[in-house]
Amino acid sequence: MIGTKSKFDTYPDGKIVVLGGSTVKEDVLLAIGKQLGIDKTRFEICLDYDALQKYNVRKMQYAPQYRVILCGPAPHSGQGKGDSSSIITELENSDAYPRVERLVAGNELKITKSNFRAKLQELVDEGYI
């Protein structure tokens, strides 16, 4: 699936947000980023499924310091989802958020080492991050 493009300008060296429940540890994701030449300070990561319900996505509205949001499995309810059916739907359908990319394994949202690496590599190759 092709990610949604940001409707406003974001900083090319902005934050890479990773949202979604995962068994892959944050340190592993940061190491993958480092292997691709991405500094760990660029990442903002929330991998705890329960913590995602309290994660306020609205802080990223029209915030150019956020470059891209990588989404794995997330609760349907959560802060900032507005009238949307889920947090991810809100992020994808609103012009107020930076570019959104889904991390998918098989036919389901899932954060794996391989799809995380592949998505980051795709964004690097594209010159987006």
Task: Describe the residue ranges of each PLM region.
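N-terminal targeting/trafficking signals and adjacent low-complexity tails
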Residues: 2-6
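Ser/Thr/Gly-rich flexible loops in soluble cytosolic domains mediating phosphotransfer, phosphorylation
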Residues: 86-129
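Redox- and metal-dependent alpha/beta enzyme cores, enriched for Fe-S-associated oxidoreductases
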Residues: 7-57
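Alpha-helix C-terminal capping/helix-to-coil transition sites in glycosyltransferase folds
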Residues: 62-64
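Extended, charge-rich low-complexity interaction segments
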Residues: 66-88
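Structural motif
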Residues: 50-58, 110-117
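Short, aromatic/basic amphipathic alpha-helical patches
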Residues: 29-34, 81-93
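Short acidic, S/G/P-rich loop/turn micro-motifs used as interaction or catalytic elements
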Residues: 22-26, 50-52, 72-79, 107-110
